[in-house]
């Protein structure tokens, strides 16, 4: 609706809008002003509404969450779906704005290197996507999951953005020691083979064994060709063998021989993945797709709630247990309930932290 200009006002007055004395008729000016005010108010309302709509649209756009997959493997899509569903549910329960976030799932092969700055959070799944994010997405908040600690993708040399967080598949070594403790009080002597330069694993294992009052026997190797000799020496002195996620020691070439050697000595082996248990290990603490999704979900919620994220490198927050009943029977070991093992581990973990 166009606003009345001064010429139109004059025309209105020339058409009998004056009284006999030539003065404007009483109330005409006030009526005209009221019309102007009403129309100006209408325009202001439209302007405010437009600006508000633009602000809401910008906020919604900035609230987008992008999940980048390294490839088309089923596990990536399973984790991405679990992240989406669990995050929306948690954000809704906590009344966070991420409950209305738009989740996008893409593979890195379909992306342009110049990704727009319209995502509040980016999640990468797998090593390739994490490496892509390091190179191209250093202006975003990034959570990289489904990556092993041994990949050494994290660097503190300043080449990485301070808002790139690494959520490792690896379980803390203490959880594997807790599993051994929960399986049987008879497992007092624990054996483990580690790389000679892996001081972090050595320190962590020694501390955990001390807390749980277990005797730890460590064999260190410099060369993968020495695994057999070190393993045989170790198996004579232990009740149970612990595998650590070191690809120099445990890989497609060595796993079968390690399992056979342990089985011949009637020594159960604790793995670090579900695949290891399916191959012949007695049990393992590992990260399921849902565990990984929950860990990512918790970090996303912290961003939206303004909470501080304390560490850029994070070990798995959640865990699952897999127990191989067939291996247990072949070793004359009693079958254990996974729920029972989890409960025992959690209770003992609480005891050691009290």
Q: Model-flagged regions — what are they?
A:
Residues 57-354:
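Short hydrophobic alpha-helices and adjacent helix-cap/hinge residues
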Residues 33-36:
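Cysteine-centered motifs
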Residues 42-51:
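Bacterial N-terminal signal peptides
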Residues 53-55:
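N-terminal signal peptide c-region/cleavage motif recognized by signal peptidases
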């Amino acid at each position: 609706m166009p606003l009345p200009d001064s010429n139109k006002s004059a025309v209105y007055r020339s058409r009998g809008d004056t009284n006999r004395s030539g003065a404007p008729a009483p109330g005409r000016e006030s009526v005209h002003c009221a019309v102007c005010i009403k129309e100006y108010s209408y325009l202001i309302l439209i302007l405010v509404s437009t600006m508000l709509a633009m602000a809401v649209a910008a906020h919604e756009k900035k609230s987008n969450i992008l999940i980048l997959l390294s490839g088309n493997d089923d596990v990536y899509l399973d984790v991405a779906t679990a992240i989406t569903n669990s995050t929306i549910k948690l954000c809704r329960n906590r009344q966070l704005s991420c409950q209305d976030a738009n989740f996008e799932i893409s593979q890195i092969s379909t992306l342009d290197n110049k990704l727009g700055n319209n995502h509040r959070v980016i999640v990468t799944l797998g090593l390739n996507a994490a490496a892509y994010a390091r190179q191209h997405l250093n202006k975003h908040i990034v959570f990289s999951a489904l990556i092993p600690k041994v990949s050494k993708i994290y660097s503190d040399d300043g080449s990485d953005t301070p808002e790139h967080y690494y959520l490792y598949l690896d379980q803390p070594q203490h959880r594997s020691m807790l599993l051994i403790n929960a399986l049987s009080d008879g497992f007092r002597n624990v054996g483990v083979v580690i790389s000679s330069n892996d001081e972090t694993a050595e320190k962590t294992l020694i501390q955990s064994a001390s807390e749980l009052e277990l005797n730890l026997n460590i064999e260190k190797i410099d060369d993968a060709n020495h695994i057999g000799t070190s393993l045989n020496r170790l198996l004579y002195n232990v009740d149970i063998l612990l595998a650590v996620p070191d690809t120099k020691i445990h890989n497609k070439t060595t796993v079968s021989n390690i399992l056979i050697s342990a089985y011949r000595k009637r020594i159960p082996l604790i793995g670090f993945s579900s695949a290891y248990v399916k191959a012949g290990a007695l049990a393992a603490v590992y990260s399921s797709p849902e565990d990984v999704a929950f860990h990512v979900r918790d970090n996303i919620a912290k961003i939206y709630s303004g909470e501080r994220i304390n560490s850029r490198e994070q070990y798995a927050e959640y865990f699952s247990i897999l127990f191989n009943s067939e291996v247990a029977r072949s070793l004359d070991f009693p079958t254990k309930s996974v729920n029972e093992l989890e409960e025992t581990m959690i209770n003992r973990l609480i005891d050691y932290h009290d």
